[in-house]
């Protein structure tokens, strides 16, 4: 017998925070990906530019650790950013085997464009929530994430 309402989620799932977070994350990821693609960018571009802008020049390995991107993906994304002159690579004066990556003025302008686009995406994602609930949700998600990413005791 076929379920007469195939889009209705079982109550056991709909009441699980893990299920709700996963489903929301899938939709959020799609919105971010589509939003950035509309301005010819990717999420890795934003993450790398934001990391460089906040922390300054860094090695590719440090960028990967700080932005949560695997080193092989860092290299590919940096190649794309360098082609557009949003970043420059130069040999590290203290270790010539390593490159130091620096954001350029064009990269900072691109970062501002991406921030504006991502603000629109956040508004779309969180449309049903008023500003105070958006802030509450962000605070609660940050707390849960911090709990699960802190080093073991």
Predicted regions and their residues:
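C-terminal regulatory/oligomerization modules of transcriptional regulators
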Residues: 1-10, 131-153
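N-terminal leader segment of winged-helix/HTH proteins
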Residues: 1-39
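Short alpha-helical elements of helix-turn-helix
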Residues: 15-19, 39-50, 72
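Short amphipathic alpha-helical elements of helix-turn-helix/winged-helix folds
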Residues: 23, 27, 51-55, 140, ...
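Charged, amphipathic alpha-helical coiled-coil/dimerization segments
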Residues: 57, 61, 79-142
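The alpha-helix within a helix-turn-helix
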Residues: 64
């Amino acid at each position: 017998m076929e379920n007469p309402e195939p889009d209705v989620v079982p109550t056991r799932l709909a009441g699980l925070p893990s299920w709700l977070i996963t489903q929301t994350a899938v939709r959020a990821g799609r919105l971010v990906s589509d939003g950035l693609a509309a301005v010819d960018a990717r999420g890795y571009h934003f993450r790398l530019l934001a990391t460089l802008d906040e922390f300054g020049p860094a090695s590719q390995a440090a960028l990967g650790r700080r932005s949560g991107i695997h080193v092989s993906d860092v290299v590919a994304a940096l190649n794309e950013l360098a082609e557009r002159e949003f970043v420059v690579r130069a040999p590290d004066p203290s270790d010539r085997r390593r490159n130091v990556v620096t954001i350029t003025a064009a990269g900072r302008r691109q970062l501002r464009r991406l921030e504006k686009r991502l603000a629109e995406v956040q508004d779309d994602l969180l449309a049903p929530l008023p500003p105070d609930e958006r802030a509450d949700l962000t605070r609660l998600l940050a707390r849960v994430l911090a709990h699960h990413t802190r080093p073991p005791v």
